[in-house]
Amino acid sequence: MSEPLRIAITKGRLLDDSIRMFQKAGASCSELLDPGRRLVLDVPELGLSAVLAKAPDVVTYVEQGVCALGIVGKDTLMEVGGSFYEVLDLGYGRCRFALAAPRGFSLSARRGTLRIASKYPNVTRSFFRSLGQDVTVIKIEGSVELAPVLGLADAIVDIVETGNTLKANGLEIVSEVAPVSARLIVNTAAMKLRKSEILELTEKCRGVLNA
Amino acid sequence: MTIFKAASPEGTRDKLFAECLRLRGIRSSLMELFSSRSYKEIMTPELEYYDLFVRAENPLPQETMFKLVDRSGRLLVMRPDCTAPIARLVASHFKDAEGPFRLCYDETVFRSAAGLDGADSELPQCGVELIGAPGLRGDIEIVSLAVDAVRSAGLRDFRLELGHADFFFGLTEELGLSREDEEALRACIESRSFALLDELVAGYSGEAAQCLRRLPYLFGGPEILDEAAALTSNPRALAAVERLRDIWRELVSAGRGDCISFDLGLVQGLDYYTGVIFRCWTPGAPSSVLAGGRYDRLLCDFGLELAGAGFAVYVGALASCFECPEPEAAKTLIFYESGCLAEAVALLGGGAELSCFATEAESLEYARRAGMKLLVVSKNGIKEVDPNV
């Protein structure tokens, strides 16, 4: 038996969903459910050893090859980019990127350069580039909905799940930007050097997800 | 000013003794190998005109290039790639010559790293270009030299992966894809985005579409070639598979087949490559340590009807796979009386260094502290002094 494949999993909701998927695939996930002080958590049934990380770090770990695999949201992949294989849409962690603005806002009615606030400046830039519209992007670290309320920006680009937060702040969705869900990513060299193990795992996950 | 005193620019760093030894060792064994195969070294300028790298086929985004402005206001870049300058060199110096020529280089390319991800902006590369050898023999020479290159650098556990541009182009041509869709599809296969690929191909039916859907999985041992050949009847794609098989057979008979694998989904930089494409992977390196292929159109851009093929070894990535011990400190100190410099210098090498002190007593004291033995060279000859007595 070769050494386990190291996988980086995004902490939080994606971790819970990932544990559920692994359990359906036949793993007990006892270490993942109760990490204690351990930093590296084994999932022996699937030949994995997991580390938990913040989403952008998952991408860094996989790109640099210290983890062969990673589970991370498409939102992060779109924002930070990088070079890796994106082999599986895991289907969970579903939400979407949307452009939202105070009621009555219309993209075509405004003249002059729009100011758009977002936690995701790269996603925002490439969305407006695809529309052929030049905008000023303002990076905000949290509570992006505040920006139009305070008059800092005309509209925001953010992750939307239910839309309740938007509504509570008098905002509505102007345009969908992109759907988001969790992805399984693979380091390029690992894919080549450990093909059979990785494909076996992706097939297992695919089987569970389609069940 | 002072805040930058201790820092080097993002993506660059100082390299000290052990790392230098390791890099130097790899570079010299590669260059020795290339020269033994009749590849002649060339050097192109570190600085080039920006325009050289903004031809349509160049896959390098402009923000990755370091730019400068010369006296007359023209835009220059720090060489971001070796092949385009070499194409320029061939086009301007070998206009009327007939191929083949064999060229090799040991240079640094500069690419502005995105920052804070540990990537280097200065990338040492050693590589070869075989110009004017369009056929199978040219492919075989380049691929087998690539195997020998990583071996000569000391790598034992590695995989050289072969693909062919025409497999992908044969299929997309059959589907009649627009340039844009073709690029979207290529990006999908490059990043193995299986889900998105299914979506893109969904509108098409038939053999070529089926085969494209399967393309990201078409990597592995020689059995992949049989699988690929069974999936398509497109003549261009089949010819690509046969070419790979021919290369592989020759390498196997030359004892270089064990490390060869195939990836027909190897579609990076396809704008550049027109035939065989290859990359070398090894455990311990997060990305490939060598990349190359055939680019028969590149020289045409420079007005020369000549085929080209070559590869570059990413020396930095390769070096990171090896441990290298720190160079040893000198064990012997040599103090010489005035007039005996020549005799003292003759004793250097093998871990000896000259004493910088003016007297034998000071030299002795230094040797004691540094744990060295002392040789005293005088007109009467050489005597060894044990500093601990």
Whereabouts are the PLM-identified features?
Chain B
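Beta-rich nucleic-acid/ligand-interaction surfaces
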Residues: T44-Q62, G163-E173, L266-T274, E362-E365
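TRNA-binding/sensing appendages of the translation machinery
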Residues: M1-A84, I140, E161
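Extended alpha-helical scaffolds
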Residues: S152-L160, A165-F168, D181, A195
